[in-house]
Curated annotation (Swiss-Prot):
Organism name: Listeria monocytogenes serovar 1/2a (strain ATCC BAA-679 / EGD-e)
Function: Forms part of the ribosomal stalk which helps the ribosome interact with GTP-bound translation factors.
Gene symbol of the encoding locus: rplK
Alphabetized UniProt keyword annotations: Methylation, Ribonucleoprotein, Ribosomal protein, RNA-binding, rRNA-binding
Disulfide cross-links: none
Cell membrane listed as a keyword: no
Protein's recorded name: Large ribosomal subunit protein uL11
A GO CC term assigned to this protein in UniProt: cytosolic large ribosomal subunit
Post-translational modification: One or more lysine residues are methylated.
């Protein structure tokens, strides 16, 4: 019979940098998970994506074992990396902080496709463009 799920924990952790300190430790400690076991496994799985923030969904079972699924980095993180900026605009409708090309938007949309609720790359691009607009990043043709 399948194991009974007791908790599902969602976190956003920098790739390859999971450690038992907050936010990872307290979130997993409450569920009774082996924190170091998770940290080692997560860091090994995300070592090639250094510098990005990786969303992860950790499923904890009744016997305190766990599985986890890593998602693609948030569109905002990918846009900031493509535009080479530290953070988005505080006033996106007034102050534009950077610009990205349509090709960069398409590349980000293709990266995000597995996690987006989009039927094709064009609709995924529209979602990424909306995120860019809300961050004060303009899109160049």
């Amino acid at each position: 019979m399948a194991k009974k799920v007791i908790k599902e924990v969602k976190l956003q952790i920098p790739a390859g940098k999971a450690n038992p300190a907050p936010p990872v430790g307290p979130a997993l400690g409450q569920a009774g998970v082996n924190i170091m076991g998770f940290c080692k496994e997560f860091n090994a799985r995300t070592a090639d994506q250094a510098g990005l923030i990786i969303p992860v969904v950790i499923t904890v079972f009744e016997d305190r074992s766990f599985t986890f699924i890593t998602k693609t980095p948030p569109a905002a993180v990918l846009l900031k990396k493509a535009a080479k900026v530290e953070k988005g605009s505080g006033e996106p409708n007034k102050t534009k902080v950077a610009s990205v090309t349509r090709a960069q938007v398409q590349e980000i949309a293709e990266t995000k496709m597995p996690d987006l609720n989009a039927a094709n790359v064009e609709s995924a691009m529209l979602m990424v463009e909306g995120t860019a607009r809300s961050m004060g990043i303009t899109i160049q043709d």
